Amino acid sequence: MKETKSAGTQTEKNLMAAFAGESAARNKYTYFASKAKKEGYEQIAALFLKTADNEKEHAKLWFKELNGIGDTAENLLSAAEGENYEWTDMYDGFAKTADEEGFHELAQRFRLVAAIEKHHEERYRALLHNVEMAEVFAKSEVKVWECRNCGHIVIGEKAPEVCPACNHPQSYFEIHAENY
């Protein structure tokens, strides 16, 4: 992704802090909304969610200023690198510290989440490979493709350009998988 005009400045640090703060607030408010709903406060839950949506948009403003959104391949690489940091460095360090401080159950939870982050990295790298090799909607063997809009099934090496049932574009197709 491109470097920003504010690179290396306090303004860049402020943009990163604003993005992090707005992102954290969004998540926190969605958790608060869930709790309010469980306690029977529908209006309060709705207002927490409305505010969470506002915070999401605020975060997006600052993330865009930081040139944080690239094309899909750049975004997949960025996501994979972020997940790699989380499982190889961040959670590993957190687990060691928790163990040293006697929080062994929390250390184990950090390790379990690190394993999930490793899976996330692998998934993003596989998707990046598919994008780079133009293999998102075309495979070397016959697959069952499903339209995510209407559920139409197509069998072949590639997804159709347009769904014959609902006219949605190829981008709505994915490889059909039963997981139940």
Regions found by a protein language model. Name each.
Residues 1-180:
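Non-heme di-metal
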